[in-house]
Every structure is written in C-alpha cells, then in structure tokens.
Amino acid sequence: MNAMDSQSTQINMEYQFTSDRNGITDKQRKDVSAILDVSARFKIFINDDLYFDQAEFPILEFYTYLYNWKKAIDQSKRAQEFHYYTLEFDEYEDGAILSIIPFGDSARLKSIWAEQELYHVFDLDYLIRAFLTLEKDLKRDIEAYFPIKLDKFIKHIPAVVFDWNR
C-alpha cells in the first residue's frame, strides 16, 4: 500500500450503551464486577467495512485504557502503542483485543477479535486523533448516560500497566 492509500484510509467508531442507565453509581466505584458489567455495543469501521463488532463490550474498562494511553502521550509528548486487554478474557497469545501499532509516520489497527482481516495503514496522527476523540466522547457520553463521575472511578478500574515509550 502506498502513502496515498494510507492517507485515504478512514476509521469510524460507534458505540451504544447496552447496560441499564442506573446499572452503576458512584457508590460502586470500587466494585470491579459491577464496573466490568457496564457494557456497550462497540463497532469499528475501516473504509465502511465492519472491522470490529462486540455486543457486550466492557466500556468502562476500555475507557480506562484510552485514558491511561492519553496520559502517556501527554507526558511523553510522543506517539505510544495502544493495547487493550480485558480481565474477562485471558488468552492473548495472538495479541490484544485492540492495538494501535505505530511505525514511522503510519500506524496499523489490529484486533484478535476482528470481524475480518483488513490490512490498512493509517496516517499516525489521524489514527491517534481518532482514538483521542473517542476517549473524550466516551467520557462525556458515559457521564451523561450513567449517574457517575469517571474521575472518581478511574483509579479503581483494573487495567494492565504498560511501560510507555519516553
């Protein structure tokens, strides 16, 4: 794939909460099982092709990974790999549920749960901006839908800790 093709690769991410609006409250911020039960239908389209589709995706846990990744980018002032794993699944020999793999000024999106194998190369800045926008939108929408403040939850939501590139 040449550079022109990578410039035209587009990503679209959609989510719809599947958990009850009152399924979690600020009082449950330390309840890991309640946190993991909060789910959404999460889809990723690459150039209008369905790439990733999970009906009961643990959205608070995923948000935590995005939040930690955003912090690592802010602190290091450079692009970082992103890898999402869930506590509910433990077979990762083939990789993470979702990964952003940067190389040069480009990046790939990879998933062990992909609906179909698509090998698309993205502009690195474009893909990072798309996932940082997703983090911001998720925070806004989670707090609007559920009666919680993520700032109170974030330190209690389990997540794998990575050694970020400095």
Language-model segments: residues:
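Short linear sequence elements within intrinsically disordered, low-complexity coil regions
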Residues: 20-22, 89-90, 151
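Compact, well-ordered interaction domains used in eukaryotic information-processing assemblies
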Residues: 55-94
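An exposed acidic His-Trp-rich patch
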Residues: 80-126
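N-terminal domain-onset segments
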Residues: 1-9, 159-166
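Mixed-charge, glycine-accented linear interaction segment located at domain edges/termini
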Residues: 112-166
